[in-house]
Amino acid sequence: MSSLEQLKATGTVVVSDTGDFESIAKYKPQDATTNPSLILAASKKPQYAALVDAAVDYAKAKGGSINSQIEIAFDRLLIEFGTKILAIVPGRVSTEVDARYSFDTQTTIEKARHLIKLYEAEGIGRERVLIKIASTYEGIQAAKQLEEEGIHCNLTLLFSFVQAVACAEANVTLISPFVGRILDFYKAKNNRDYTAQEDPGVVSVSNIFNYYKKFGYKTIVMGASFRNVGEIKELAGVDFLTISPALLEQLNNSTDAVPKKLDASKASSLNLEKVSYLTDEPKFRFDFNNDEMAVVKLSTGIAAFAKDADTLRTILKAKLEA
């Protein structure tokens, strides 16, 4: 049995992390996740030119100013990719709200509702879509409101326990705690390597998983952003893992053992203290601000996603003006 099959056998749901949907079918993932960087990368590939053209044609038909058409084409392109992905995976696709709205609760809510409307116009129900939102205080508040409306959310760029606690209290459907980016920070800061067992990203996700299970939170923990298969194996048994096609391929080609490492039933006996952040913004900000890694990684993550979204807009603008 391949390492990938063994991972699935531990109870972990495997998700594909890519916009390049042609590369995922053979791994039989349950869900797929996208982000602006992945959509940008896929949009540059010749085999996806038709999707970009379809989004541009859709925006041209809607008319309006060039800036208005760019926004229409941008949102439409997310739906074009999402729709194609949902023809391959049986579960859900995650589609991200523009990172520039990461500190704007109301606009995030409005964008999410709009994306869901676009999907529903294509005959895709909201139960098959997760709206990805950065795990800022404002983003978590937006997600709380959206979940109450039946719009399911994936809270991303999650680097700290503080963010994770607030997300659980907001009853969000799923969180994406990043593993590899946490490792990147500590490797650079401390100028050393880490084994998979001591990997700070692995430790972070394990702690969040155990806290959620101990206190009965329903929010799904989906580890994300991996640098190697060692990190993935250390999280076997976690609810979900979203994995790039390159690492899925490594797992598929390996027969190394993948024993279950995380077990919800064992969390109940752990001596953990319950804390609260959702309705205490000063406490959230103070405790989050005391985690240098989380502050740096959230900031650079939002900036990088926003930059790639702007690059995508530039590509769409050129096509709209052609």
From Swiss-Prot:
Disulfide bonds: none annotated. Keywords: Pentose shunt, Phosphoprotein, Schiff base, Transferase. It comes from the Eukaryota. Its EC number is 2.2.1.2. PROSITE patterns: TRANSALDOLASE_1, TRANSALDOLASE_2. One of its GO terms (molecular function) is transaldolase activity. The active site is at residue 132. Homodimer. This is Transaldolase. It comes from Schizosaccharomyces pombe (strain 972 / ATCC 24843) (Fission yeast).
